[in-house]
């Protein structure tokens, strides 16, 4: 299947650099939503025949996004290309369960079929089709209501036709009032009124029969509103980006589907529960179609439902077989027929769910995830469980035919399937095919050799496979280590030592790649060899390491490998660092920790690095402490500091002159407050009239006064010798002033409070 870039074929003369650049971006990055939006906005202003290639590319890249299909169809409808509209609906309508797209479909049928003689039949079929597919949507109220209004508006001639009309309306009402949708209360009121108009006596009976199911559906509708709050059903489906918004949407969809799986309607109808869960899953796949977990979970649910129904059918057969044997032979035929009907019903439903599970997995590997091996493997295992081996072979071959994938893991799983289903000979034929594929890596030889050893119990065949792989992957230290592990497992000491010598002396491994093999060789000799062989391997390894720059001068670090065992080391982690052992072999020091043992005492030492880090505060929320000489009490959590001013207030204070620029006159605060205390104010302000000699013209006095400023007394510069010249204050980010520009203002000469304090101080002396 072609990639997303190959699906973009836009042939439009934009005439603007901005649009040309947007097209170049989407050709490079097909899922760039912003660039697509730029072109879509321009395309909506042009005729459809000029921009049809854009819309085709759009729906090919985003095949599950209902919003883009809706834009495309609306453009075709606007130009009255109804044949194209019907083809577009055939391509997308059944696959995309989006309420807005289905409403557009009903609008199209209503507009285009109104002139036909069979208009009413066409509309009724369209409504039935829509409600069958989208009727469980939480926001499908308008479709239910429109269908009811349509049926009630149909003219009925004769009693038979009238009864048919009433039956049809009642049937739709009764389905609607037990379906959890927003606005179900209004439908219930309309239904009760409808039954009252027909027959008040029957109405009460109908309401009593349906009220319990209605209350249950209304409760679920309220809960669904909560569980679906925040879901964006119109997001374009793009590959996972792990953004915060995407993670949130994934969690919301999981919560929605989990809620549906909990059977909120509390029904015993397994088919209804499965339908509702799959409806929610299908809507989720419109947005998260690039997420393989959603596809896999959907298939798992269907598979589980099929198994439950199968077990239910078996359990029913066991429970009903005893009563059949106890009845007379004459009546046993009726019992057997009833039993067969119930058993066949469950089995048939289970088969439908199993086929739907296969359909879900088939859609997943034929869609945008056609290169996802996980879904191929899950599908293959499912079909293997149904004994459809030919289909499994077809799936594996289909995946292997993709040119731009690594087929190694596919061959490994293919061999395992062939061995399980058809025996070891079939697996060997797959291994032969894998060896001939130049894309295959060393893993296929390891998998084939271990399969022969564990399944056919023939270690000689496994030896030959490993030797065959060594000719091809002798320069791969990973493959060599797998071969060594196999020989060690067999306890073949001589063969293992020979393999070490062959690999290390053949020259197939570069010095850098041979480090791991040398370390393993030393470990091997430390476990089973004598001291002379250990020292010999150490010397040979040191000779190789001398040519590597990163191992120069670390002879002591190389000695550690002789005495270590698993995660036990002869030095503490600090000492290992000091001798360069961590840099030598890349050990994880936090694993050493207390496991390191002292050479002298042998006791476990406590490593300071193993101590968990202390929690640190959020420094962005801390208040800067800036002491001021005359800080008001309570202005800061700590004495002597002040809160930073808001940005607007700080900007205003920066434009005001400094306090020492004001030289008087100064108001006597005590006299001013004494006047306020003795002042008797009326309850209400006097109204100006001729009797109290108050006139509105008095308040116009300020307008007639010309204020004269003596520029000789104040020019913006202090003339007093004792006054401290003002300094400009620099506004810092955050609305505070610079600390180095703080200054202490000179007290005014007419400060009454200061004079009184001086007099009291003189008297006390």
UniProtKB/Swiss-Prot annotation:
Compartments where located: Nucleus
Main location: nucleus
SMART domains cross-referenced by the UniProt entry: HAT
Molecular function as annotated in GO: mRNA binding
GO cellular component labels: mRNA cleavage stimulating factor complex; nucleus
UniProt GO BP: mRNA 3'-end processing; RNA 3'-end processing
Region span, Disordered: 595-615, 727-747
Record keywords, A-Z: Nucleus, Phosphoprotein, Repeat
Chain positions with Phosphoserine modification: 738
Intervals holding HAT repeats: 46-78, 80-111, 118-153, 164-197, 230-262, 387-420, 491-527
SUBUNIT field: Probably interacts with an RNA-binding protein.
Protein's job: Essential protein, may play a role in mRNA production or stability.
The protein, known as: Protein suppressor of forked
Origin species: Drosophila melanogaster (Fruit fly)
Gene behind the chain: su(f)
